Amino acid sequence: MSGWPRIYYKLLNLPLSILVKSKSIPADPAPELGLDTSRPIMYVLPYNSKADLLTLRAQCLAHDLPDPLDPLEIDGTLLPRYVFIHGGPRVFTYYTPKEESIKLFHDYLDLHRSNPNLDVQMVPVSVMFGRSPGREKGEVNPPLRMLNGVQKFFAVLWLGRDSFVRFSPSVSLRHMADEHGTDKTIAQKLARVARMHFARQRLAAVGPRLPARQDLFNKLLASRAIAKAVEDEARSKKISHEKAQQNAVALMEEIAANFSYEMIRLTDRILGFTWNRLYQGINVHNAERVRQLAHDGHEIVYVPCHRSHMDYLLLSYVLYHQGLVPPHIAAGINLNFWPAGPIFRRLGAFFIRRTFKGNKLYSTVFREYLGELFSRGYSVEYFVEGGRSRTGRLLDPKTGTLSMTIQAMLRGGTRPITLVPIYIGYEHVMEVGTYAKELRGATKEKENMAQMLRGLSKLRNLGQGYVNFGEPIPLMTYLNQHVPEWRESIDPIEAVRPAWLTPTVNNIAADLMVRINNAGAANAMNLCCTALLASRQRSLTREQLTEQLDCYLDLLRNVPYSPDATVPSASASELIDHALQMNKFEVEKDTIGDIIILPREQAVLMTYYRNNIAHMLVLPSLMAAIVTQHRHISREALLHHVEVLYPMLKAELFLRWDRDELPDVIDALAREMARQGLITLQNDELQINPSHSRTLQLLAAGARETLQRYAITFWLLSANPAINRSSLEKESRTVAQRLSVLHGINAPEFFDKAVFSSLVLTLRDEGYISDSGDAEPAETLKVYQMLAELITSDVRLTIESATQGE
């Protein structure tokens, strides 16, 4: 480019460089989209806009991609490196230049016909200034319409810092030429497909138009389901129809979001400013699979784990910066206090009560509102655990909202609904101290303004944040496979509960929890806490801690927990340095070296972070515990031990493997442990390696408390086979509390009611407890004897003495 065009672009770039601060999606386009910079690249943009072109150019130069203003020279032919699909309007709408996109596509395809070695990568790129979806009434033109020069000027002026450049996966023109030919009709088809691609991308980024709030309420009131519920309310409470209708409207006011794009923009600025100071980085993985779902027109339901109140803001912030619409979020009614409630509502929160029981009108209004969100195409987010995890582990799922999601499908909607499990991880959770108090019996403090300000005042260095998108569950595909007759239950008017609904919802919920854990994120904090809590003194020398972290990292890298799980790329030493900056540990220096100590008062709090990744290390920890106690054991005996205990572990930690997959997983882990020198592996015999016994013992300690808990319950069951489930849970907790005091066990979840409740249910499912409440004494005793070999003699004596004299 030379002469006047260069001067023109330089002059235009001056104000743009000041006004525009765009973000690239994905953050690093070349590696994330598999672009090969050694091969020719050309860019396709939806509209003829020099502002868009220069904004794209800035991102290309920042990411070492070819400059779109530099023409491509192919076989002596110079062609522009960019193509505008549409000429775009001008100030004077009757003057529109002739589109050149089809001619340029044809020129590029023609070059491929004459040069069989040529393969140009065509990269669709959309540049967006602002993402307001607009309202259903009041605007004639669609959002993100083509802007003329004056409109574009004001868009850049007002929204230049809320802009992003979205790179899409490349299309091989060589493939197009070989598969479809190179004539002009193919060029026209290519331009038409590109137009559809950009239209879908706009919808994914902006979302459907927002309804006027009162219009939405009127539509809901007119629905037959709510009309019937209002009549029932009037009849059952002996009130007038008008009063019952007012009650329904009051419930809508309580529930419904009041989404505001301007509030999203403002909050994005505040969060961007705040999190750059609080977090050292927010790591996002597998976002492309969600962008693809949105592009393909799926109704997306985000289902994250729930660690902190920060989850609401973090996920919306991440999705917004991934070029997606922030979802409507189901938030607990406890957060509907001033000023947080109105703010959250404008950020897309709709509020849900803890229970729907005994209030038919409320459940009907909520179900119809949720169904309306789905039918309008809004993405939705809810926490399937129902509340924040106090222990750092996943809670058993609450299936009410999930059941309503499937009932929404049974209304006969056309858009496919897809559930997206999400793992959210932190190196610091601001509520962790409160969680520990609540687990010790303190009453949960009601959320209010003062509590929120206290929490904000404590925010300091939060380390890294992690948002990992798991493997989606397309509901239509799932139902087609597991409930082929599901379409017979479609009823566009009444909410139906076919016989298959409850078991199917329970299975989907369990699958979601497994997929959330599959996307787990190991980090410096949870790895260091795992190692230090494994030490009985809660302290290790720096060399010992480095060695232990190397063990964990090698296990997680060489035998990955799942394809979606993430492991730090940093070295063990770098992770320790980072963890020390979080000010959770103490360092004592002597003439030999550093000793890293987890203070007693911090130990209980740090179990939270260890529990975040307990599922990723529990199987190698269990294997290490078995080998450590037996000194040497055959592969068959090891496999038998694991297979007996695995159903309890799978139910408690939502592990991913089926029982028939265990032999291969155990073999892979055994080979890795042998490679590390932790054990020797010869003739299907596993034997402890004395020179690495400390590392193996620390690895084994990860399963220590779980085995002790199982031993308590199996001992009580074998000592009293006729004990009922309720008493078994209660007595197990009592013995666990006693054990934690006598043996200094600092983990709050050690005697958590939910953990023992889940364990007893699994024992029933596995046949250790029959439907009549009687255990199988012989089998129960065998399992206890196996567990007794894996725990220390003093712990065993405490457990067995707890039932003596009864």
Swiss-Prot record:
GO cellular component, one term: plasma membrane
GO terms assigned for molecular function: glycerol-3-phosphate O-acyltransferase activity
Pathway field: Phospholipid metabolism; CDP-diacylglycerol biosynthesis; CDP-diacylglycerol from sn-glycerol 3-phosphate: step 1/3
Superkingdom as given in the UniProt entry: Bacteria
Keyword Cell inner membrane: yes
Location within or outside the cell: Cell inner membrane
Keywords: Acyltransferase, Cell inner membrane, Cell membrane, Lipid biosynthesis, Lipid metabolism, Membrane, Phospholipid biosynthesis, Phospholipid metabolism, Transferase
Main localization, broad class: membrane
GO BP field: CDP-diacylglycerol biosynthetic process; fatty acid metabolic process
Extent of motif HXXXXD motif: 305-310
Documented EC number(s): 2.3.1.15
Membrane topology: Peripheral membrane protein
Reaction catalyzed: sn-glycerol 3-phosphate + an acyl-CoA = a 1-acyl-sn-glycero-3-phosphate + CoA
Family matches, as InterPro entries: GPAT/DHAPAT (IPR022284), GPAT/DHAPAT_C (IPR045520), GPAT/DHAPAT_LPLAT (IPR041728), GPAT_PlsB (IPR028354), Plipid/glycerol_acylTrfase (IPR002123)
Domain notes: The HXXXXD motif is essential for acyltransferase activity and may constitute the binding site for the phosphate moiety of the glycerol-3-phosphate.
HAMAP family per record: Glyc3P_acyltrans
Annotated family: Belongs to the GPAT/DAPAT family.
Name this protein carries in UniProt: Glycerol-3-phosphate acyltransferase
